[in-house]
Amino acid sequence: MKKIKPSQGNKTFCMAPWTHTYLSPQTERRLCCASREPAQSFKQYIDTGNNSKKYKPQSLDEHWNNDHMRSVRRRMMLGEKLKECQVCDEKLLNTNVYRSYWNQLFKNKIDEAFASTDDSGYTTMKTISFDYRFNNLCNFKCRMCGDMLSSSWESESRKNKTWNKDYQPWMASPLREEIKNFQ
């Protein structure tokens, strides 16, 4: 496999899959807070219709070198554009992209990322950056947010009876307790 470093023109490479992990209040794991992985990438992804609605959280060790993460790293080293990284690729936030942030923050680790990652995408690098959101406690109700990340939006959903435990099972008591216990 021909690995292409950013210094060789790779514009899609990001250090997040080598250094960072994100965990949502529902214990879903992602590349970062802005990544757009499809639901089928996650065994514990419980907020879509494409699941068994069973709570199966994934530990960091299970997640770090799973098939999805290895595929992401492999494709990034090849310079491929990833649909998971649409927010950065298309500058959807109208600001500096997270990729630039990660690559600047960990620029001294780029060579290590390439050296420690085999052709399958498996890496021996360890996570050093954690964005763990243990609950959705937030008193804001920003328009772009929702009940997954804002307790204010969750309260409004409950008050207006607009939530459905089939589609938002994390709001139901038994599952809510399991999530708290996992964290």
Regions found by a protein language model. Give the residues of each.
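Canonical Radical SAM [4Fe-4S] cluster-binding loop centered on the CxxxCxxC motif
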Residues: 31-39, 131-170
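Leucine-rich repeat
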Residues: 171-175
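Short, intrinsically disordered, charge-balanced linker/junction segments flanking boundaries
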Residues: 176-183
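Accessory C-terminal segments flanking Radical SAM cores
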Residues: 2-131, 149-152
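Short, flexible hinge/linker loops that cap or flank conserved catalytic cores
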Residues: 123-124, 136, 180
